[in-house]
From Swiss-Prot:
Cofactor(s) needed by this chain: Zn(2+)
Protein name: Protein translocase subunit SecA
One cellular-component annotation, GO: plasma membrane
Molecular function in Gene Ontology: ATP binding; metal ion binding; protein-exporting ATPase activity
Keywords from the UniProt entry: ATP-binding, Cell inner membrane, Cell membrane, Cytoplasm, Membrane, Metal-binding, Nucleotide-binding, Protein transport, Translocase, Translocation, Transport, Zinc
Amino acid sequence: MVSLGGIARKIFGSSNERRIRGNKPRVAAINALEDSIKALSDAELAAKTEEFKGELAKGKTLDDILIPAFAVAREASRRALGMRPFDVQLIGGMILHENAIAEMKTGEGKTLVATLAVYLNALSGKGVHVVTVNDYLASRDAAIMAKLYSFLGLTTGVIVHGMNDDERREAYACDITYATNNELGFDYLRDNMKYERGQMVQRGHNYAIVDEVDSILVDEARTPLIISGPLDDRSDLYTTIDAFIPMLSAEDYEIDEKQKSANFSEVGTEKLENLLKDAGLLKGVSLYDVENVAIVHHINNALKAHKLFQRDKDYIVRNDEIVIIDEFTGRMMPGRRYSEGQHQALEAKEKVTIQPENQTLASITFQNYFRMYSKLAGMTGTANTEAEEFQDIYGLSVIEVPTNLPILRIDEDDEVYRTFEEKFKAIIEEIKASASRNQPVLVGTTSIEKSELLATMLRQSGFTDFSVLNARYHEQEAYIVSQAGVPGAVTIATNMAGRGTDIQLGGNIDMRLERDLEGMEPGPERDAKEQAIREEVKALKEKALAAGGLYVIATERHESRRIDNQLRGRSGRQGDPGRSKFYLSLQDDLMRIFGSDRMDSMLQKLGLKEGEAIVHPWINKALERAQKKVEARNFDIRKNLLKYDDVLNDQRKVIFEQRVELMDAEDLTETIDDMRHELIDTIVRTHIPEKAYAEQWDVAGLKTAMTGILNLDLPIEDWAQEEGIAEDDIVERVKKAADEVMAEKTERFGPEIMAYIERSVLLQTIDNLWREHIVNLDHLRSVVGFRGYAQRDPLQEYKAEAFELFQALLANMREGVTAQMMRVEIVREAPPEPTLPIMHGHHEDPQTGQDEFAAADGIVAPENRNPADPSTWGKVGRNEMCPCGSGKRFKHCHGALLA
């Protein structure tokens, strides 16, 4: 039966088709301008940029100039890059400009499509960020596309790991900036830990185009970026607790692979309590007494380390370190760590050096970072399966852009075997058969362990002519993938390794030329070699086409259909022929954890012999249903996490905006005075309730508060004895006394040093309280889930209590700032300034506990200091000569304060 929706779509077309159709008149208008634009000289074409900027300054919008701007960008691309965007690529550029995701298949030129929207939006002068998944792609794309942007008079910058603040600031100041999502997020967090506006590197969040948008905004969405500092070493405790786990039997714990959780049974808990008592680690009677919370946390981590985390699948051991493996790409992530002590538990399990834990100093999720942009767009080959999530969370619609040429790839039905061994034997035979007919083969595996198992089995079968691409061989990744289209080539790759590098039949000509011509001087010999390479690649392409194009063999289905589609999409680029097939077994993770019992019983009834497979469209549909369930569950998890993170995000925005205002303010005296007066009002009215009799006043408590908080020794007892005195009189007298102290300090220190002190005290107090607040919210979030058992909504409870904690933070800020300002003194000799903790940047997945430490180098002192401008000084050591040029040490000059 045809649905009403289906009938409507036949008559009116889908929203996707309408969006594509709606842009075709603009494409026609751009094409109509082509001849006149072509007639312009290079200088005249480049001058169009200033002309467009002038039109925007006069009130025109970007939409008003889209048609001529796209026409100019297309012609400039032809001249600078030798590439002319197709009509469908123009449509892709329009979709990116319209705050949407352009779904474009592999090989359709997404990088070139982005240049159209980038050029148009860069004309506003507010900056455009092009976001990639790794430094290699950011550097590669920036280097190539800078030729185009430079031709048009625009500047291009790139941010990669290891750059200092000056280099980053310069790159962000460019019209177009290429960077990874990690670098952008960490720079935002680091900027909001700076003490001078001039030290910040970013200049706002205007427009971002996210390449591989599904990877960044979905796969990594629930993974916060965290900057942290190390805590005390507790390696002995991890080692002691790790030794308990091998003593347990299967009845002592329960493992849930679906939820990735591990818990102890009653029997296991009793056994652990005895072990902990013997080790002197158990306090009180029960393991679950309040004082044992930390020990329970350590034990749970140790259990997960042994029972949920697999070596060579989730991590590898290298150079005395645990190195995490990205579950989506199979790549190593050196320097990244699991959070909440999980990484230390793995280090104890594998008997490597246990690194100290870390305290969160600042954090943000990608969901909330990218929602800060005024305009956001994305590109990928596979977004449709996550269309609801993109719309729900980011307000981004997914538009499928037609391919320039029809897709000729044949996607075959899955083959299902009973065991791993049978499946791998069938794959090996298929690889050999394909290689014998010169068909290039890309084999996708889900883990290092599986890729190396397949490689070993291939060698044992006598077949050795293949390449293995997994986390262990990360350095050669791009080149190995680029040559996977050579006739007869067999490439085994973990999951989506090499994503972002095109697999061209015959091999990637650009990468071949770059590699083979490296170091050769320009001249006849180099030209001859280049020509020979081009002819060789052309002949190889014809041979690969004749063999049927790239054959993608998948050894397992991923729990996300999108990852499967990405693997399939490596074949059949730009109208090339191709083929894809999934080989499965009942022992695969997806089949074992999520597959239905019905499928298992059906295969048993069929009585399959060893080595036989079943192939039926019904199996594909059953697996797709299982994948949809997993995707829906993961979406719900991400959506729920976002609701909690939004609470923190709202508070983060208030604090970060407040910091910027404080850095920008010329005079903070009024702010400090208001804080002090509000605090005095609160203190007095706490100890002298409104309309209370004098004998009900807490005079002793008020006296203690005045001394302890305000550092004032006032005759409170005498005042209280005065006839007819009221609380308002006390408030005014205390304010007057405090104001006199501060006025005397200002006169003694001088206005310049006082302004420096005020700003430093305010920012340091906010930062310290904010770090404590993050820890408090983490603790609240970890316990609030249990409120559901009492029929209370955990989210509403979290919101209410988080608000109370935030109000307490603001009150503590008033008290902390006032207490420090009332005590601050310039001294002749100050104790050495405590060093800041070494800071690390990393990701943390709240579900798996995964961290991704991408080293954050802390606050880098600018090298060029202007003596007259303290904002350029950065962090100055107390024993350094003062940058102001006075000839005194910093601690005796501008740094001469003891808070």
